Amino acid sequence: MSAHITFNKNLANIEGSLIRTLDAEMQKIPDMVRLTLGQPDFNTPRHIKNRAIEALEKNLTTYTPSQGTPDLLNAASHFMKEKYDVTYDPNTDILTTNGATEALTASLLAIINPGDKVLIPSPFFTLYESIVEMAGGVPVFIDTVKTEFMLKPESIHEAMTEHDNVVGIVLNFPNNPTGVTWTEDECKQIADALRKYPQLCVISDEIYSEFVYTGKHVSIGRFLKDQSVVINGLSKSHAMTGWRIGFTFAPAHITREIMKVHQNVVTNVNSIAQYAATFAMSDGIDDADPMREEYRTRRDIFCNALTELGFKIAEPNGAFYIFAKIPDGSNQDSMAFVLDLAKQAQVAVVPGIAFGAAGEGYIRLSYAASIEMIEKAIERISGYMKGGVTHEQSSIQ
């Protein structure tokens, strides 16, 4: 008799990551310029790697407290105060997680009951929708296209009027995929709007906080600490995507609930990574500075070139992505455009539809790539847009 296994119904409509699926296909094609993943092309700073070696030599290879090592929690608290002027008690308000993804997952699982609704400004990083649905919740999207990808207070009020049983909202700034972020005044306006709904848990994904090009990042925690979970980590700021170090920063009563999920799913984060991360957030508190300047240069080169080719761009002031509107004359949806660009010019980008229906008609390009690769991409995209094939056609279907 064959097995007849049933699965969680919440998974029925959840697909694998379109971004990663496309990237895996693109990797198979020789000489493809890949501008797909949000993967820094810098190496983890040497001093951090040395600390990981030191941890191994000290045999720091056992379980740690589920919340994180005391030294790391203290370093994280200092980092948030020094960088963003928000105070979190390392003993009660901070949780170390397996990257920002686990921080998001544990936070949403902690607040959602079956049928609860969560607001998600759109376009959005696709995991937000998937996690809400896995938790049995219902995502409610707020279209930001008409406001140049900026969430507005009136949009929050409108969504709260139209929907009942809304328990949370997921914010993301600097934003993936658009690169748009908020000034201090804009952040305060959003906080003031959300404060009118004390039942809302505000989950603020601020993983790109160290990459703001004009002004400085302002955390929602400065204005709305009592009802916010701020999510951050070292994947982007310290080029540590594989180390899986993330955090939640929230009031103690919220942190306790998130901790229940974390402890029962993960136990604790890798001990060696935690040791190295302690020094990343102390000795390496400004490690992102040279990366930021390099990203700024790349952004400017890429934005200028794409604009000249007819793409419309909401200028990205943060993260390392460009969200470009496909020129009207292409007569292709975003998926068709991306597949044709890969086939004809061997440049891999992400279709806007991967970030929700509001992303249709756009493509996301990552400038977490060398200037040499960006210039090669510009040359190939230029040839493609002008109707010529600049490179040998690939076999992509």
Task: Give the ranges of each region predicted by the language model.
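Conserved N-terminal alpha-helix of the aminotransferase class I/II PLP-enzyme fold
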Residues: Y63-T97
